[in-house]
């Protein structure tokens, strides 16, 4: 079942997809979005960034103890042309280094 999160259909679809994945894994998934149907940035670029952030949050949550798992998302317009994305999730506390880079 598709839940409706915002007026922008493309962004709504991305969030709905990750909401369904979180539900399938019984991870609490909370969303607060205040965006118009048309945004001031390229939708494709925005959705690529959003998908990457949500994928990382889901992967990190799956690696933590069940009682700590959660994903909280806030997306809103700030000023006239800025969009702020805030994603909070639990993680196992291990910061991984790859080729000397975190």
Cite the ranges covered by each PLM segment.
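Short flexible loop/turn segments at helix-to-beta-strand junctions
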Residues: 1-5, 40, 66-68
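Conserved short strand/loop->alpha-helix "switch" segment adjacent to the catalytic nucleotide/phosphoryl-transfer site
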Residues: 3, 30-49
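Short beta-to-alpha transition helix within the HATPase_c
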Residues: 7-23
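Conserved ATP-binding N-box helix of the HATPase_c
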Residues: 45-66
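Short beta-strand/loop element within the Bergerat-fold HATPase_c
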Residues: 68-81
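Glycine-rich/acidic phosphate-handling loop/turn and adjacent ATP-lid/helix
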Residues: 82-102
